[in-house]
Amino acid sequence: MTEPAENLKGIFIESDQIFQIYVKTTNSDQLVISTEVEGETFETLEIDTALQNDLLYITTGRSVGFKAFDDKLAAHKVLSVVLHIELPANKELWVNSSLASVEAQGAFSYLNLNLSGGRVNLLDFTGSGVVNTLRGAIDVETKTTKIEASSRNGSLHVATSPVSLYKLTLKSVDGSISVTQSE
């Protein structure tokens, strides 16, 4: 899917069926979304989009008439969904998921990630935001960002920057947090 994004504030992904989300910012004015879906019931997956409050909402569901398996092998009939997103620079990224891990690279106007099991990897990250994980580790490579980090049971390795143009709050219950600041 390719859409013009000049009027979008950003994207909001809410799904417990997506396994991995890759987001990279670009200098283009186009939003590009592609998916990889594997599993025995892949054809029943629906990726739904809707525009609300200038955000493109992305959710997942099953097609009408889909019935979940109720047999001894049901636990082995898993679905793997991976999203690849190219987002124009300086847009917002919001993700709520109990399963997904997120890898984001580039410049964002705001980032809000709330993940239960997934990890977060921010590469060459510029922007402000909040990252919360329950079990997943948080790794950030940034510059000129004030970092507030806390983990109840994980380790903290946080580099500070003498210049703070942005603020990023990182919290995890069981995950470790690592931040490097490049010059």
Place the predicted regions along the sequence by residue.
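Intrinsically disordered, low-complexity terminal regions
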Residues: 1-183
